[in-house]
Regions:
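Alpha-helical rod/repeat scaffolding segments in eukaryotic adaptors/tethers
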Residues: 33, 37, 41, 65, ...
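The feature marks the first
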Residues: 2-65
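Short glycine-rich, low-complexity/disordered patches
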Residues: 64-75, 97, 104-114, 190-202
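Mixed-charge, glycine-accented linear interaction segment located at domain edges/termini
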Residues: 149, 154-209, 218
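Intrinsic, low-complexity N-terminal interaction/targeting segments
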Residues: 2-29, 83-161, 215-216
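DNA polymerase processivity clamps
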Residues: 70-81, 128-140, 196-208
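Acidic (E/D-rich), amphipathic helical modules within compact regulatory domains
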Residues: 38-99
Length: 219
């Protein structure tokens, strides 16, 4: 892992989803790159921990904690995290309202054209662009950072020597960093992956504050 992506060019993505695959025992990131291609990226538990460590290490600098007395750090982080998640909830509601309005404008069921049936199981179809993430590169700005991933093409890399390729880069503002931390923790809980993290400023996604505690350790 290095701090700058150097001369390698990475396709940018600003839209992605994430789910846990019990079959792969990995998180699968499905991203739409700005060049129009869709890519699937496999994240191992080790790689997820690396991403989380980098996000948490950069967060104090991104949020200006260095200018804040250490005694107030947890409170500032908690307020920033709650604000970021509230913004996401508002954006999600707006998207849901737009989708509901679009569905309301569709023709009645009797007039609708028959659509092609979707695959019953998404794992039955191997994505055209599938990579195993093996390297994370981080570039930090004043109030933003970019995560860039390299990896091996799958399943080709399992049967023959393959070159490491740039998968995509994700530009993140401060709110996005908080939202990604929450998303990764949520998916790791679903995967039942133990996270050696303590983050008292973040509410566990399942609301189970009694059994799961996350607090940030400063070194």
């Amino acid at each position: 892992m290095t701090n700058k992506p150097k001369d390698t060019t990475y396709p940018i993505t600003k839209q992605f989803s994430m789910h846990f695959s019990p079959y792969e025992d990995r998180l699968i990131v499905r991203a739409q790159r700005t060049d129009g291609t869709e890519v699937h990226m496999l994240l191992t538990r080790r790689m997820v921990m690396l991403v989380l460590q980098q996000l948490l290490n950069k967060l104090p600098e991104l949020t200006g904690l260095e200018k804040t007395p250490a005694v107030y750090w947890q409170e500032v982080l908690q307020m920033a995290h709650q604000g970021a998640m509230a913004s996401k909830a508002a954006a999600d509601r707006e998207i849901a309202d737009q989708q509901a309005a679009a569905r309301a404008d569709l023709p009645a069921a009797g007039d609708a054209t028959v659509a092609a049936p979707e695959a019953s199981n998404p794992t039955d179809v191997v994505p055209e662009h599938l990579f195993l993430a093996t390297e994370l590169l981080v570039q930090a700005g004043e109030e933003s950072l970019t995560l860039a991933f390299k990896g091996l093409p799958m399943p080709d890399a399992m049967v023959k020597p393959s070159q490491y390729q740039p998968i995509f880069a994700i530009p993140l503002e401060v709110d996005n960093v908080h939202q990604l931390i929450e998303l990764l923790i949520d998916k790791c809980q679903h995967a039942q992956w133990h996270l050696p993290l303590e983050l008292p400023w973040i509410e566990p996604p399942n609301g189970d504050g009694g059994n799961k505690k996350y607090s940030l350790r400063y070194h």
